Amino acid sequence: FMNNGNTFDWNQQTFPKLLQKVGYQTAIYGKSHLRGNPKGFDDWAVLPGQGLYYNPDMIFPDGKRRIDGYCTDVVTDLAVDWLKSKRKGDKPFMLMVQHKAPHRNWMPALRHLDLYADQDLPEPPTLFDKWKDNAPPARNQELEIDRHMDLNYDLFVDLTPEYNQPASQKRQDRSAWHNMKRMTEEQLKAWRAAYGPRDAAFHKAELKGKDLVRWKFQRYAKNYLRCVKGVDESLGRLQKTLKELKLDDNTVVIYCSDQGFYIGDHGWYDKRWMYDESLKMPFVIKWPGVTKSGSRDKHLVQNLDYAETFLEMAGAPIPEDMQGKSLVPLLKGESPKDWRKGIYYHYYEYPSVHMVPRHYGIRTSRYKLMKFYQFDEWEFYDLKKDPDELTNLYGDKAQEKNIKRT
C-alpha cells in the first residue's frame, strides 16, 4: 500500500489462509479497512471503511445491517458470541478482534464521557515545540494543535447533527459529525448533557495563546483515553471469556496497533511522520508457559513479522517469499545474533491530509536518518542523547561516521 485507499487483493496468500490449511478455524470481527469481503476466514463481520462509533453498519457474509450500540461493544459482543457458540471445540482457532477505537475523530462511549473530567492530564514536554532545529518540512505541515485543530469537528465544541459549517482546513475529518446523524435521541441527549456545560465554560473563558492550546490538548487527550478505556474493557471481557471456557492457559493473546500517534507531542495531533511518537506502536503478548510475564524486549521488530510469528506458533510452514522474521525466538527470551540492525520507513502521501511531505529513513537502536526527498532535506538524530528528536545533527562533521554507518 503506497497510498491510503489502494485496493487489497484478497486472492493472494495470507496467514489466515495458511492457518486454515493446517486445521485452524478463523474469524475476524471489526475494522478491516480493506476493500472487498474478507477471505481466509470461516466467519466474519467487518465495518465498512472506518465505520462509525455509534450504531455502526456491519458487513456480514449475507449482507450489511445496522447494529445498535457503541462500536467497541458491538465488536466485542460478536467476538464473545463466536467464542461461546460458533467455535468448534475440536479445532485450534485464530480470532482477530479489530476495533475502530481509538481512530480519530474519537467518540467515547456514553459511560466514559465523565472520565478524567475532574483532573488535568500531564502535558507532553514538547507541547510547545516550534521545530527550530528540524528541517523546513516540520514547520510547513497542517497538524498543529495551535493552528489546525478544529474546535468543532475535532473537539466537538457546539457540534450537533445540524451544524454543517465550513471546517478550518480543506481536508478536515468530519467523521464525528457524520456519526452524530446516526445517534439516537437518547444518545444525543446524554452526549449534550456531558459536553454542553463544558462548551459553555470554554466560551466564557475566552482563552487565547498557550492557554487555548492547553485547553485543546486536555479535551483531545481525554477523549482519546476515554476511547482507549472502552478497548481496555473489551480486552478484559475477552480474557474473562477465555477463562470461563478454560482456554486461557492454552491461548496466545496479542494486543497491537497499526501506528503510534501525536497527542500534543511536538505540538501536533495525528500521525504520519517518522518521528518516534508515530513510528513506534504497541505489541503486548501473553503466551502462557513460554513468554515470561512482565518481560520486555528491545529488538527492532515490525508488523511484517507478525505473519511468520503466527505461523511458527501454529506449526505451519512459512513461505519463503514472506519478508518478515518470526518473533518466536524473542518471545522465548532468546537473542538471535542475526537479528536486524535497522528498520526502514517510507511515507508517500503528499500532498494529502495534514500535508506531511514524503520522506523515508532508517532507524537503528540508537540513530535515525531521514530524508525529505522532494526538498532534498535531511535529518539525523542520536536517540540515546536526544529521545525527543529536537536536535538535528545532520551536517555536524562529528557525526559523519555515524551517518554513513546508519
Walk through the language-model features, giving the residues of each.
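Residues forming the ATP-binding cleft of Hanks-type serine/threonine protein kinase domains
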Residues: 384
